[in-house]
A protein has these predicted regions:
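Glycine-centered small-residue hotspots that permit tight backbone geometry or close packing
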Residues: 1, 53, 103, 125-126
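Catalytic loop of short-chain dehydrogenase/reductase
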Residues: 1-54, 66
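A glycine/serine/threonine-rich, flexible loop-to-helix segment
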Residues: 2-20, 67-90, 130-136
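C-terminal helical subdomain
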Residues: 34, 39-42, 61, 69, ...
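Short, small/polar-rich loop/turn modules that mediate ligand/substrate recognition or access, typified
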Residues: 53, 58, 116-118
Length: 136
């Protein structure tokens, strides 16, 4: 089984250790929910892009990878979650700076991105491409 907060929770439940599972859930600060919510945003953008585009509404999203923020630092420094963070492959071998993410957002809000519609822009140092090389 992989070493990540969700796997730790499932392992504890399979072993009948509900108390430890609850501890992991509390420690993970909603890691599972956070990941699922990012997927939900991406799916909503893709499903609404055509309809909203016809109404003149531009709809795109950014999918940032690990970025040096207080939330990232809290996870990276956590004694349990930090191990999972370290295990995430980043081909660029570092986390993003907030300015790097902001630059992509600035482009997406500019006239240069006027023709973009229904796009999810991954700014993750290549993590998505490495983990899902055939997904578009």
């Amino acid at each position: 089984m992989r070493t990540d907060p969700e796997s730790d929770i499932v392992r504890c439940l399979l072993e009948g250790n509900e108390g430890q599972a609850m501890q992991y859930i509390g420690d993970s600060h909603g890691a599972l929910t956070y990941g699922v919510s990012k997927h939900a945003v991406a799916r909503a953008v893709r499903r609404r892009a055509a309809e909203w585009g016809q109404a003149g509404i531009t709809l795109n999203a950014i999918a940032p990878g690990m970025t040096e923020t207080p939330m990232f630092r809290g996870a990276a420094d956590h004694p349990v979650i930090g191990k999972s963070v370290e295990a995430i492959p980043i081909p660029k071998t570092r986390v993003a700076s907030p300015d790097e993410i902001a630059g992509v957002i600035e482009f997406m809000l500019s006239d240069a991105a006027e023709y973009m519609q229904g796009s999810i822009i991954y700014v993750d140092g290549g993590t998505d491409a490495q983990l899902r090389p055939d997904a578009f």
